Structure formats: structure tokens, C-alpha cells
Amino acid sequence: MELKFNIYKDSWMDNGLENFFRILKNLNSCNIELTDTSIKLKIKNKENFIKELIKKIIHEKRQNLLIIEKDEKTGEIKEIKKDHLILQEEKKIGGKVTFKEDLYKPEKTPEIVSKIFELKKGKTRCILCGRAFDKAVKKLQQANYPFVTKIASLSGVRSYKDGRVLSLREYYDNLCPFCYLIGILEWTDDALIYRTFPGDKSFLFLPYFANLRELHDFKKSCIYFGILNNTARYSNICVYPNTNDVENTPGEYSTLLCFYEKFIANATDDVIANNWAILQIPFGAVKNVKIDFINVKEGVLGTIREVYKNGQNFNYIYKELFNKIYFFSENKNTIDWEQTRDIQENLSKAFLLDDFRDFTNCLLPRKGGYVFFSSEVRQALEELIFIWRWRRMGIPKEKLDAIKSVGNIIAKISRNNASLLYKMDKVRAVEEFWSVLREIARKIPGMDEKDLKMIKPTALDELIQLVKDVVKKEKDGWKEVRDLLVVYSSMYYAIDKMPKGGGNQ
């Protein structure tokens, strides 16, 4: 028996196809070949093949759906279904999870697998792969294809293809048995990242490649280098490779950035994913799955690599920089952890999406408090800014001194009223930019004598000349300078607010 499964150009099904390849790869009863656009399966002995596949599903793959935990009150060891799974369960029997899905019921698995491989040609065309078949095993539903929603007003598949949204009505009858199997088994994939926030939602990260071999190479590296711990319930990114401790990232983008750091540190030269479909799966009975499609530019990945390999003050952008930036509440006179985690998440998002404008906004002082960090973190932030933004403009590092000095001036003027700092942030045209610089110049003579000793007034002239030079090369280059000014102003504002703040610039 010979079968061919072509690439779907669909993030869920292509990851499922790659997972299916890894499941079958070590079975003795078949030969399987992976190409750029398909997998080719040759079954040598159908009876033995079905037995081997059943054993693989029951004794190995099913375990990837579960967490084993000890009940703190009774001491009983029990199974718990992973929170991100869109698989319904029945009442536990003896502390063991019982899935409603027959494929994952050990007593029903043989029957389902046998039915799937009894496929005969028919008049029905599969909605996902186009294969002609005679009889479905299951309808298209969230358990085998999570992009279908149960909410009637929002029904349809949330997927993008060739720039268009393709919508399917829910519960299609024409799903072929093979697509059902590939889709339902994808939940067992041990090469996917997940992050759960109890009682709220889970994120499931699906890498996307147009080439199945590249997808396989990437996921194989994730497994081989021990980056993921799939026995953990809420997060599966290991703090250190092949250990049980996992990262406690604050959100979607910080999780992805944290993963990239682990991958680059352990699989430096291997194939890496730029494109992701990230499923946001809510808690509760009705699950309207949202999807973010993310493309991480090569330049951003290059910055992560550069920092890891050659960083002078730090080697990890999330772990050693964003994760050590906090929000201090002046009202509470302590760290506001909710705001802190929001800022860490938003910094990660702005960086991964290469959005320096949003990045600078994260560092602005807010009502009732300000963003702060240690001198070591400040040095790391300056190095990141140079690698990520300044160097690509082809301007020497020493030219940053003028921006830093003017940022210090803005911070001193804004100490008791941050309106000037906000005004700089809101500048939208170069004429407004010059106007704010003139306002800064007018305010310098009225500064406290102590502050005057701690600033460099001539830095304004240096900055003006720098901006003129930048604009000659790139018309909108002044915007990058504006954003850098906001970063340094926010930085020195926080330093001044903290004990023993400020410094000669």
C-alpha cells in the first residue's frame, strides 16, 4: 500500500503532517520519505503497521496530552489534561483522564485506526486535501482543526492564504480520514511551544515553513537540544536545556523571544523559523480561537544572534534586559508587578515586530510612576539600541553621546512635570521636532544651578547638526533620533527619580 500526503500550506495541517512523519519514521512495518512538498508512505505489512501505529499512539503520543501531578491533599497521583488542548474529556476513572475522542481511548484506538486505513475511493472530496474518499471518520471540528469556531456568528476557518481570508462553515462532513488523523494527532506534537495563563488563556506556537524538510529540521532541533519540557503544565520552555524548570514569561511575545534566545544559544547555525501562527485559546467551554500571524525579520533575528555571540554587557535580550526592567509605583512606593509584566511583554512585542516607536513608548513615565532599571541594565539597553537601530543607519557610536546628553537635559527639565518629554514623544513632523528643541533651549537658563552643573548645553547644537546629517541620508531619519531621545529622556528621568540619581553628561 502506497500513500502520498502533499503539503497543505496551512500552519496546523503542515505541522500535523511533519508530526505524522516523525510518528511513522521508526516503525518497522513501513518506509516513509520526506520531501520538500510531501511525505510518501509505503506500508509493507498493513496488519503489522496498524498494530505498531496503535501502540505508538496509546503508549507514547497520548502521554504528550497529559500532565502527571500529585494531589496535595490526598497524595494521589493523577493525570491532568493539558490546558491548551481543545479535546473534551469525560469523567476521570481512577485518577486517569478519559478523552471523548475515540482515537485517544485505548479500547477504541484499534477500531478508529483500522477504519482510517480502510480508505476507499469515493465521490466525496476532502475539504482540506482534495483527496477523493467514500466515508468520513469524523466531521471537521475544533478537535481536529482548531481554526473552526463553535460560535455561529463567527463560524468559519480563520486562515490566510494568498492574502485572502478563507472561511469554511463549521462541521464540514467532507473531511477525509487521513486529514482527521493528521489533525487530531497534532495535539501530541512534542516540538511545539505552549504557554498557559490559568483561568485566562493559552498560547500555542505553530512554526510555518513553505518547505516540509525545513519545518522538520527546525522542529527536530527543538527536540534534540532539549529546549522544551513537555511534562510541565503551564510553560514548556526550559530555563536550561534538558531540565525540569521552565520559564515564567508574562505573555505571547515574551514567550517567543525567550524561545528564540534558547534556540540560538543551543542550535546556533540550524534552520530557524521566521513565520508563526500563534493560537490564542481561551479557557471555558466555548473556545473562539484567535490567531496571530507573525513574521520576525531576519534583521531582528540577527540582532538576537549578535547580542548572544558578541554582547559586551549582556547576551540575552529577554533574560538579561527586558526581564529586569520594572515599573515603580510612586503611589504604592513599590514595584507594580502587573504594570511591570505588561511593560516586559510590550517591549518583547515591539522588538520582535521591529517597531522602535512602540518600544520607546514602553519606557515613558506613566501616571503615578516610572520605568526603572539598574545601571547594568541601562548599559545593556544602550548596547541593544546601538546594535538594533543606530548601526543600521551607518552612524558612529560616539554620535550617540549628543542624543544621550540632550535626553539628560529633557529628563532634568521634566523632573516635576513630564509634559516636555511627552511633547517630544508626540512630535509627528520635523518642524515640530525643531520647535521642541527650541523650547528645550529656552528652558535651560531657568534650571537649578545644581542641574546646570550636570548637563552639557552645547549638546543641543551637536544634536541639531547630527539630525541635519541624518536627514541628508534619509528623509525620515529624524524620527529615529526622536525615538532615541525619548528612550534616553525616560532613562535619565527614572535615574533622577531614584536615590542618588543623575550624572554628568
PLM-predicted stretches and their roles:
Residues 1-124, 135-137, 331, 345-346, ...:
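N-terminal alpha-helical interaction blocks
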Residues 3-7, 30-34, 39-43, 65-68, ...:
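Hydrophobic transmembrane signal anchors and adjacent membrane-proximal interface regions, especially
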Residues 24, 57, 113-120, 129, ...:
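Hydrophobic, Leu/Ile/Phe/Ala-enriched alpha-helical segments that form helix-helix packing faces
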Residues 77-231:
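Basic, glycine-/proline-tolerant helical and adjacent loop/strand elements
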Residues 178-182, 349, 383-384, 485-491:
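Extended low-polarity, hydrophobic cluster-rich segments
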Residues 220-475, 481:
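Intrinsically disordered, low-complexity regulatory regions
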